[in-house]
């Protein structure tokens, strides 16, 4: 069973790790597109409704995505047809439930939208841990940046964040 709960040091999880792109779309998506091309990345996983919608809208189709259909801007992802399947899970704020972890395990294989009832934010860590080599995990930072994580470059360091999670 794989379940984690954020119990302490929330400040560490709000930090804009490691590549913060402080540009609005479509420029932010173009920067990631260039990073993918220049770095030889094969997989892109998006976490969050706004980021996923922007990637889809500007033609950078994620390998898989996680959304919760709740944004400050009222934006919804409606192009689920870009993916083979939709997996619905329950994942409360501050958690990575066993059900959500299993869905991310399927999602890293490609073509999956993980549709979360609750909150999808913490699933970025599951994607970072489970993504295959040559992957990027992208999500939105609460202050407006697009965060892009080349997993091969930063996985070891970012997995230290699991030390601040409690098993549940």
Swiss-Prot record:
Pathway participation: Cofactor biosynthesis; coenzyme A biosynthesis
GO molecular function: GTP binding; kinase activity
Pfam family, one: DUF359
Enzyme Commission identifier(s): 2.7.1.237
Top-level taxonomic group: Archaea
Positions annotated to bind GTP: 49-51, 68, 70, 120
BP terms from Gene Ontology: coenzyme A biosynthetic process
Keyword tRNA processing: no
Keywords assigned by UniProt, alphabetized: Coenzyme A biosynthesis, GTP-binding, Kinase, Nucleotide-binding, Transferase
UniProt xrefs under InterPro entries: GTP-dep_dephospho-CoA_kin
Catalytic activity: 3'-dephospho-CoA + GTP = GDP + CoA + H(+)
Listed HAMAP family: Dephospho_CoA_kinase_GTP_dep
Homology family: Belongs to the GTP-dependent DPCK family.
Purpose of the protein: Catalyzes the GTP-dependent phosphorylation of the 3'-hydroxyl group of dephosphocoenzyme A to form coenzyme A (CoA).
Name of this protein: GTP-dependent dephospho-CoA kinase
Organism taxonomic ancestry: Archaea, Thermoproteota, Thermoprotei, Thermoproteales, Thermoproteaceae
